[in-house]
């Protein structure tokens, strides 16, 4: 298939640049993968889409304030976007400036902090913090929330809360697992009251999630790598859920990719997984774990809309997106959501 097959025209006014007043106030487009049936709902209707005994799997990564502004010793301004924390002092990062820093160059940050350029790895720079503090402490002090480029505004104080799930736990993401942004504590409690089980995986979303696919044929695309973990407790819950005839519902494409990465790495039955994953899911992929998913509306020609098309059917997703645009759903990170059931193989 060609990347252009996943293109669509999106009016600029449908890009959500701010979240709704309440997390659960978004709209929800329901898509049945088998029939292609669509239903326009409010997000709170998710409680009607799930059944007692179903297992909802969330990504508990925490977004770090990964955008830093600084200067080279020569005085030139630069911007740093953390891709990954290597340890307490070192990061891999994208650096935007007029002239790339060289090895041993010092970068001056706000509040007197400094970083040394240690090495270059293709498009990424390895930087080391010159301080007694940890990199996470410095990011929390002087870093900015890494809003996606399509939001097209500076980050604000409110983004520290709203570009973060309420159940975040493990720092490391530089982009939010956005399907989870719609859930508040009351919604999670209501799911529990209904008898829906919950489980948590971790996938530290990288900046590569915003990188455009730069090839014509999807098979030529090289997927970026991200760190993910699926614990044995989660594996056991999935096995119990399936054995009892209930569904595994992934909240977000990152949860889908975590679970399917564990399945890909397992010899037979699903096993625990911890490590880097570069799983690329596109039409033709046979899903091993996930039966339904909650997801936001994705960018044209992105790997995420390819994943959704693999899950619910290429034509079905294309029709659903045309419907969403006509009905003026809000798109991307701060936008509305979908509840999607898998198309039978």
Curated annotation (Swiss-Prot):
Keywords: Cytoplasm, Queuosine biosynthesis, S-adenosyl-L-methionine, Transferase
GO molecular function, one term: S-adenosylmethionine:tRNA ribosyltransferase-isomerase activity
Biological process (GO), any one: tRNA wobble guanine modification
EC number: 2.4.99.17
Similarity comment text for this entry: Belongs to the QueA family.
Subunit structure: Monomer.
NCBIfam families noted in UniProt: PRK00147.1, queA
Record's protein name: S-adenosylmethionine:tRNA ribosyltransferase-isomerase
Species this chain originates from: Shewanella piezotolerans (strain WP3 / JCM 13877)
